[in-house]
């Protein structure tokens, strides 16, 4: 059964870098790790929906996992995504991640599963490993709703004590889960690109797991809020909201983020595998204008100054 965790803060969901021939680019994985650690994040989360896990074969999945974990060298925890069509496959992926040195796994639900099946699924995955298992609750992408009652039961009876919660209205669901489970049985991370990060913290979330490509902004919001400077956290959130909103666009969010990371020098190519929508020249122009409007740069290397 997984050990308890005190995880909190900003966990960046990482893209999987490919070269221009669409092969996994391990050198860009290493440079991305170094870049992200410089922004002050708490941890890395790999092979999530943003990481194009569903577009990798098994050998590539293991290569990506091993490269991220080995290059991170324990400087921050690395959480690994699990997504399978059945319990057996999910257990295999979770155990492989554990063997590679993952600090936790975050598991997508089974397709269109009942409450009973979801409970059995997550409990089985948790029972197969000694590292924490995180529920990935994103019904808009996975097509499966995980009700607060199921989440609470998993926290109390299933050995699963964390959730990446991405079902709007996020505030109401966070409060409902906390009411049913309590803060010790279920720790809640937000997501959805950081669009509701301030409200998630106000409702009791312990952090966020998202792929926003300026993670130093989220780190500043979290640090101010955790220090009791709630007005300062709100001021930072309000300043950068236009960029958070623009970057988290359905269908092109991955392409926008890979473009930003390439421009910032974190990865060598912004290539994405099919299926996946690319961005046109006008979209790039809009993005760069939005970045400039909030006082950031798409080309400056390394951590950028974040202001209220």
Sequence positions of predicted segments:
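Active-site beta->alpha loop and helix N-cap motifs at the rims of alpha/beta catalytic domains
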Residues: 3-145, 261
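Short, flexible micro-motifs
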Residues: 12, 46, 51-54, 84, ...
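General structural feature for long, well-ordered alpha-helical segments within catalytic domains
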Residues: 25-28, 32, 60, 64, ...
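Positions that flank functional sites
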Residues: 51, 86, 112-113, 140-141, ...
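Alpha-helical structural signal in soluble globular domains
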Residues: 63, 67-72, 96, 100, ...
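Catalytic alpha/beta core domains of metabolic enzymes, predominantly
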Residues: 139-241, 245-249
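Structured C-terminal cap/extension of enzyme domains
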Residues: 199-308
